[in-house]
């Protein structure tokens, strides 16, 4: 699967309806979006904890300290291109309700387990109305407690633990090591892993160990064809990219 990172964010402003809708037009199998909780309990699509980047440095508000109405008054598109001046921060509801039939939606939770109440409020009526959403949405997070909470609440919905790697300058080893990572996967109850596309860490043995545990395997953020082919050949379940059309065309 080709997943559009924050929507088609290589072209359109990240985490906006403009980016998500463009991703569908470009043939993405799914989109990934980042979500924070506002002061008044709404779940909104934004990567950072503040609005500085998406406002082009003009407005610096902490999302968790601000109400939805104020957040949605901010132009979050012009920093990318003036033609997107009307872009606003969407809610989780807006993104879910625009999800085409059969497409995937990876919901990256950027805050902690305090999101579970509002998340339940958004999802329950939609899951009751459209049961197939269970197979369309996935939760992803770097916080294993969030993944664990999602798995306990919705055991039939995929929830993947996210991991990136840092090289220890003294030893030259990448951290976390595989043993530590797999321990975290186990305690998170994750159904899969979304991992940084690090060729020095992710090899066939790594993938085989995941498969033995029946875990899905996803990589981010891949924008070049050579790397995409490498991970496709390793059997990756999805590739997350800023340029879904480029990667799809390159893998044909």
Report residues per predicted region:
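Phosphate-group recognition and catalysis centered on beta-loop-alpha active-site segments
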Residues: 1-252
């Amino acid at each position: 699967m080709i997943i559009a990172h924050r929507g088609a964010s290589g072209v359109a402003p990240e985490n906006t309806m403009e980016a998500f809708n463009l991703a569908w037009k470009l043939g993405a199998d799914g989109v990934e979006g980042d979500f924070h909780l506002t002061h008044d309990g709404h779940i909104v699509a934004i990567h950072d904890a503040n609005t500085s980047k998406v406002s082009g440095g003009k407005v610096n508000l902490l999302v968790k300290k601000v109400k939805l109405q104020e957040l949605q008054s901010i132009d979050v598109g012009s920093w990318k291109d003036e033609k997107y001046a009307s872009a606003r921060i969407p809610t989780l509801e807006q993104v879910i309700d625009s999800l085409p039939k059969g497409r995937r939606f990876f919901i990256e939770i950027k805050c902690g387990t305090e999101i579970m109440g509002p998340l339940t409020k958004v999802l329950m009526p939609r899951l009751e109305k459209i049961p197939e959403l269970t197979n369309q949405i996935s939760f992803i997070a770097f916080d294993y407690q969030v993944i664990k909470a999602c798995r306990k609440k919705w055991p039939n919905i995929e929830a993947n633990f996210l991991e990136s790697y840092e090289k220890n300058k003294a030893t030259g080893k990448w951290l976390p090591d595989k043993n530590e990572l797999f321990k975290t996967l186990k305690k998170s109850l994750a159904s899969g892993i979304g991992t940084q596309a690090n060729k020095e860490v992710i090899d066939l043995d790594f993938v085989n160990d995941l498969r033995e545990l029946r875990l899905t395997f996803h990589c981010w953020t891949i924008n070049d064809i050579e790397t995409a082919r490498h991970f496709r050949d390793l059997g990756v379940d999805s590739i997350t990219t800023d340029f879904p059309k480029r990667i799809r065309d390159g893998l044909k």
